[in-house]
């Protein structure tokens, strides 16, 4: 069980590392020749936020909160922390899809997809851990 709890830190830490990379978010700028200029940014960059692409920055902040909650849940395994962790992970995963929903596939990168998958994997792992904890509490 303890190894599983430490595995619980891998998904938020990896997603945070991917969010720091400068290839996570895309902005397409028009030019007179017709072919758009594609520029990529980090999830923590304020430039996409300034162009009304709010999803990446909100996802990055929620991932930081998720990592802190995960560390707290590993140190002090309380049911409340696990549930809060799951709620934040679900919201972060949904918000990470915002660029694809609002602007289309051209604004979604493979790194953005990996971040979304890591957040979903974290949510699934959290649900599995909660089910195990409930089963062990029922048998005791």
Features from the language model and the residues they span:
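Structural signal for the C-terminal ends of transmembrane alpha-helices
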Residues: 21, 72-78, 128-134
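Membrane-interface extramembranous regions at the lipid-water interface
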Residues: 1-3, 79-88, 134-139
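Hydrophobic transmembrane helix segments
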Residues: 4-65
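Hydrophobic cores of alpha-helical transmembrane segments in multi-pass inner/ER membrane proteins
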Residues: 8-14, 63-68, 117-131
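Aromatic-anchored segments of alpha-helical transmembrane domains
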Residues: 14-22, 91-101
């Amino acid at each position: 069980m303890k190894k599983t709890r430490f595995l619980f830190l891998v998904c938020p830490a990896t997603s945070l590392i991917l969010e720091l990379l400068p290839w996570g978010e895309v902005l397409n700028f028009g030019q007179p020749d017709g072919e758009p200029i594609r520029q990529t940014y980090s999830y923590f960059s304020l430039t996409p936020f300034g162009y009304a692409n709010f999803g990446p920055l909100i996802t990055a902040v929620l991932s930081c909160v998720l990592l802190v909650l995960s560390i707290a849940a590993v140190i002090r395994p309380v049911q409340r922390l696990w549930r809060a962790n799951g709620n934040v992970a679900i919201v972060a995963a949904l918000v990470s899809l915002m660029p694809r929903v609002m602007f289309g596939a051209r604004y979604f990168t493979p790194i953005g997809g990996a971040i979304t998958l890591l957040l979903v994997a974290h949510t699934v792992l959290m649900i599995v851990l909660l089910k195990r904890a409930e089963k062990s509490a029922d048998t005791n």
